Amino acid sequence: MIKFDGFSIPDNQRLIASVMVLKAASAKAKAALLSGDLTHFRTWFDGTGKNAHLMKVSSIVKEIDDAIRSRPITFANATGNAIERKEQGLCGYVWLMRNPGVGDQFSKMIHVGSGMRILIVPGTHGGNINNLAETMYHELSHKVGGTKDITYDVNTCKRNALLTPQQAALNAENYNRFLGEYIN
């Protein structure tokens, strides 16, 4: 169940449309990976052809899709709060907890609990529902996959897929760019 908190009626309408885009594109992305179509995986996660992080990326993509379909998610308006004022151009953010246990780089910061709260700044999307859907996916990759913000630059994301696939698989921006390939 997806809810919205603190948005205007026009913003709510854009968010509802963005969630529809998010659901459709997420299902396509998951289906592509599960069927073995690695075209966009190679662009955004591993251009070496070794597919070293295919299982990890596929797991995160599946977990994001599962969360979209079955977990309580609240998108809350972060417009005007202290973090949004400090971080000019902020699109969204989430809060994670440090994992005290042993784990890999993906499990150092984790989401706990069944519900998720994701803060969104709708004004930075300029009314573009596809861009907003990609931001939602980006933030969900943090929540369910433990991804990090290594780079937002599109060319660096692609270069990491070619030269350092581990960085690409860990970077949240690569996930929303991957999702963008499935938005029509």
Residue ranges and their predicted role:
Residues 139:
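Walker B catalytic acidic pair
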Residues 1-133, 143-184:
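Predominantly extracellular/secreted Zn2+-dependent metalloproteases
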